[in-house]
Amino acid sequence: MSERLRVVALYPELMNIYADRGNLLMLERRCRWRDIGFELKAVSFDDRLAPGECDLIYIGGGQDRDQALCARDLVQRKRDALVEAVAGGCALLAVCGGYQLLGRSYRVGDDTLPGLGLVGAETVREPGPRLIGNCVIETTLGGELRLLAGFENHGGRTRLGDVEPLGT
């Protein structure tokens, strides 16, 4: 293999509520199809995040209790390394609750979890139905209009601040 993708999965034992590990399996398979090596390293509470040692950082979603534990560790122990990694060109893929933790805060009931503040957004769980289903957005990538398809399953509502959405 001529290339390799070095991936760090943050808290995979806790942030895997809807089998988010499937995203990593899909990424590994797509790399193999293209003859690109794939290295996966799990980073959890007692582990150090080394900014120059990864090409992609991935964080999935977890139960509220698990997200609270991870949020504290991210903010108190890993924020600076995460910011340094992204500033140095490392990609960051966050889904579900992992995405919510990138914002300024995530409110669940009477509790507000601290966010990393990497995205100008706040997420609040409001009364009403969960949003569950397939979704498609339009976005411009590389100067061309593209469609991105995905699946959403969330009860929180994210309010963007001084940032633009990926698509509409």
Give a label for each model feature:
Residues 1-87:
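N-terminal beta1-alpha1 cap of cysteine-dependent amidohydrolase-like domains
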Residues 2-5, 124-168:
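Amide-donor transfer/coupling interface in amidating biosynthetic enzymes
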Residues 10-12, 43-45, 60-62, 95-98, ...:
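Fold-independent oxyanion-binding glycine-rich loops
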Residues 14-22, 54-56, 96-100, 110-114, ...:
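A broad, low-specificity signal for short, low-complexity segments enriched in glycine/proline
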Residues 18, 51, 68, 103, ...:
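Generic domain-boundary/flexible-linker signal
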Residues 27-36, 105-109, 160-166:
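Short charge-dense sequence patches
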Residues 64-141, 145:
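Cysteine-nucleophile active-site neighborhood
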